[in-house]
C-alpha cells in the first residue's frame, strides 16, 4: 500500500543470509515485481552514504501529513545500503489513526517473514527511466517506482533544494493511486505529493543527525 514517508527512521545492519544482492543500479539489476531476492550481509555496509539519502544510526527525519488537522500515520522504516550504494527497504512498522485512535497496522511487513520481499528506495546512481520494486508483501505492500528526473527543484518548510531526485510511485494494490516523491541531496526525502486517486501532501519539517 502506498503510504506517507516515514516519520522516524532506524538504520539497521543486515542480518539475513543468502546469495548476493544487486551489483549496480541499472533497472535490470534492481528488484522487480514479485521476483524473490536473497541478500548477503557481506554485500552491505554500515556507511550509508547514498547522496540522495545519507544516514547514520541516530539520524531522525520528521514528516507530517494531516487531514482535517489530525495526524494520519506514524511509521518506522528499516533500511540498509549495499556496497554499491543502493539503499534497500527491509520492512516497516506502521500505524494509522482515526480520530486520534489506532485504526490499523495494515501494511506493516518485514523481509523474510510470510514471504515479504525487500526492495530499493534509492538506487546508487539513479537515472531517468529506471524502474524498480520498493517493497513486496503480497496483498499488503506492493509498491514500485520510476525515476522521472534527476535535477529537480523543491521547496519545503525546512528550505529550498536544487538537484533533487524526482520519482513516480505506485502500487498494484491501488492502481488508481499515484504519488511523486522528491529526494534532496545530502538530506533525503523532502516531499511527497499524491497526484492521482486523491490529494495529499507530505513535507519534511526537520531532521537531525
Residue ranges, per PLM feature:
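Conserved functional acidic sites
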Residues: 18-209
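C-terminal motif of bacterial Sec signal peptides marking the signal peptidase cleavage site
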Residues: 13-16
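Bacterial N-terminal signal peptides that target proteins for export
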Residues: 1-6
Amino acid at each position: 500500500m502506498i503510504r506517507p514517508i516515514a516519520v522516524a527512521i532506524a538504520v539497521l545492519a543486515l542480518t539475513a543470509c543468502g546469495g548476493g544482492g544487486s551489483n549496480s543500479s541499472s533497472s535490470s539489476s534492481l528488484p522487480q515485481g514479485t521476483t524473490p531476492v536473497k541478500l548477503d550481509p557481506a554485500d552491505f555496509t554500515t556507511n550509508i552514504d547514498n547522496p540522495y539519502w545519507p544516514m547514520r544510526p541516530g539520524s531522525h527525519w520528521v514528516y507530517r501529513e494531516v487531514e482535517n488537522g489530525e495526524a494520519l500515520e506514524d511509521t518506522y522504516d528499516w533500511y540498509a545500503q549495499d556496497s554499491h550504494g543502493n539503499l534497500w527497504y527491509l520492512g516497516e512498522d506502521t500505524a494509522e489513526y482515526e480520530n486520534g485512535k489506532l485504526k490499523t497496522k495494515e501494511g506493516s511487513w518485514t523481509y523474510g517473514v510470510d514471504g515479504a520481499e525487500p526492495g530499493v528506495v534509492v538506487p546508487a546512481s539513479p537515472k531517468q527511466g529506471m524502474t524498480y520494486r520498493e517493497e513486496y508483501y503480497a496483498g499488503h505492500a506492493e509498491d514500485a517506482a520510476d525515476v522521472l528526473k534527476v535535477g529537480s527543484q523543491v521547496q519545503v518548510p525546512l528550505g529550498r533544494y536544487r538537484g533533487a531526485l524526482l520519482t513516480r510511485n505506485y502500487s498494484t494494490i491501488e492502481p488508481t493511486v499515484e504519488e511523486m516523491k522528491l529526494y534532496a541531496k545530502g538530506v533525503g526525502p523532502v516531499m511527497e505529493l499524491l497526484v492521482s486517486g486523491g490529494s495529499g501532501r507530505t513535507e519534511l519539517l526537520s531532521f537531525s543527525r
